[in-house]
């Protein structure tokens, strides 16, 4: 009986030692699982960082904290087609005739200090305060209800995260029109202003550009 047990034990060792494919497969799967867990953990950490930075940015916008807002910019900003200038000078008596849209005009730190309220308008402030950050984190998108700007314009804001290029997009959609005799808004046209921010590797948001449509 004792001899039989020794033979069985030796057979078991031999069998395990001669099944390298099973051992190798288990090792490969273990490495793959660890790599996947590492990627997931890094993404979770990045998500926690950028969503907190978004909340800090939103608070700075609401509080009109210019010094805090400046950390989200790298000056000078060179915006395609000078569209940042189109926004800040839209309702201004300032004359912007130095260059055309084909030549980029730097938007400096001093320009930001002067025009930041034109950049972050009342519509931007009202909209971003209504973006649900928990929803944005979970679904990578969130949007507001339609809000009134004035008697001929309403608007809404949407926030989306594009994970392919790590970009946060804050988009204000404007609808122009009129209210009929029943108070129903009849849309005649629409336009949008896109505020694009890069989500950096440390989770900090950095302003990239403004794009205008419509």
Positions of predicted regions on the chain:
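Hydrophobic helical h-region of N-terminal Sec-dependent signal peptides
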Residues: 6-10
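Bacterial Sec signal peptide processing site at the extreme N-terminus
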Residues: 18-28
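C-terminal-biased regions
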Residues: 35-53, 71-214
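Short helix-adjacent coil turns
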Residues: 56-68
